[in-house]
């Protein structure tokens, strides 16, 4: 499993990665919304559970400045 965090400022984070069970996934967190995870998690999407498409994942990764090498591996359907 991989898990990468991009600090978006203002207590917000973009988290993304690859998991053998979930496939590609991403989450958006707002850490100013409370103390519990269920209060702070804004978006939670994965290939397996939410049918996250490769196109949507690439779009979101570009929007939140994910690492270029991760985008390249994603485009080739490889884990990162």
Short names for language-model regions:
Residues 2-29:
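Amphipathic, interaction-prone secondary-structure segments
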Residues 34-80:
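Mixed-charge, Lys/Arg-enriched low-complexity segments
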């Amino acid at each position: 499993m991989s898990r990468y965090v991009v600090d978006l400022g203002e207590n917000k984070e973009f988290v993304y990665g690859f998991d053998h069970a979930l496939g590609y996934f991403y989450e958006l967190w707002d850490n100013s919304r409370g103390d519990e995870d269920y209060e702070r998690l804004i978006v939670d999407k994965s290939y397996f559970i939410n049918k996250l498409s490769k196109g949507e994942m690439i779009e979101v990764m570009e929007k939140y400045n994910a690492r270029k090498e991760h985008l390249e591996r994603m485009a080739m359907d490889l884990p990162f």
